[in-house]
């Protein structure tokens, strides 16, 4: 599938690699911090970081997700401030990453550092049918923890 990409930072593709799939089985493309200088993110602090690119999906059957990189989250407590970024198919602006330091120490984010990943996913838009009652199921309305440990 092809999507349109605008490079908004001239360092992408020159100083820093363009996003690409690391392996044939990779689901995500790494997004980089397009910063002019390193920033220090204090514990509990959230900052908005530019990626230097805009992606226009165009196809209403797809959306983009911005997800945290597992190593940054596990090793440094660096995750997304909004947990998951949802990019609609008709959005054409720059991809931004809300970076949250949930760790205990200050984290230094360097220019060009990989900070999140972008995944393209299929979308199904639901058509709601209003009903008075649902068809009965074994689970019913059982919610959080309903099935217990198994």
From Swiss-Prot:
EC number(s) recorded for this UniProt protein: 3.6.1.23
Top-level division of the source organism's lineage: Bacteria
GO-annotated biological processes: dUMP biosynthetic process; dUTP catabolic process
InterPro entries given in the database record: dUTPase, dUTPase-like, dUTPase-like_sf, dUTPase_trimeric
Known catalytic reactions: dUTP + H2O = dUMP + diphosphate + H(+)
Chain positions recorded as substrate binding sites: 69-71, 82, 86-88, 96
Molecular function terms from GO: dUTP diphosphatase activity; magnesium ion binding
Names of the cofactor(s): Mg(2+)
Pathway: Pyrimidine metabolism; dUMP biosynthesis; dUMP from dCTP (dUTP route): step 2/2
Entry annotated with the keyword Hydrolase: yes
Biological role: This enzyme is involved in nucleotide metabolism: it produces dUMP, the immediate precursor of thymidine nucleotides and it decreases the intracellular concentration of dUTP so that uracil cannot be incorporated into DNA.
Protein name: Deoxyuridine 5'-triphosphate nucleotidohydrolase
Species of the source: Acinetobacter baumannii (strain ATCC 17978 / DSM 105126 / CIP 53.77 / LMG 1025 / NCDC KC755 / 5377)
């Amino acid at each position: 599938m092809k999507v349109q990409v605008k490079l908004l930072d001239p360092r992408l593709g020159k100083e820093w690699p363009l996003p690409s799939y690391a392996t044939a089985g990779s689901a995500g493309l790494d997004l980089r911090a397009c910063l002019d200088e390193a920033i220090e993110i204090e514990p509990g602090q959230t900052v908005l970081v530019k990626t230097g690119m805009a992606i226009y999906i165009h196809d209403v059957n797809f959306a983009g997700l911005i997800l945290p990189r597992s190593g940054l989250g596990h090793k440094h407590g660096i995750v997304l401030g909004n947990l998951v970024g949802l990019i609609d198919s008709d959005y054409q602006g720059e991809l931004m990453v809300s970076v949250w330091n949930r760790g205990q120490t200050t984290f230094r984010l360097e220019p060009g550092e990989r900070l999140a990943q972008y995944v393209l996913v299929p979308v199904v838009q639901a058509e709601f049918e209003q009903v008075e009652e649902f068809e009965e199921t074994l689970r019913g309305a059982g919610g959080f923890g309903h099935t217990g440990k198994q």
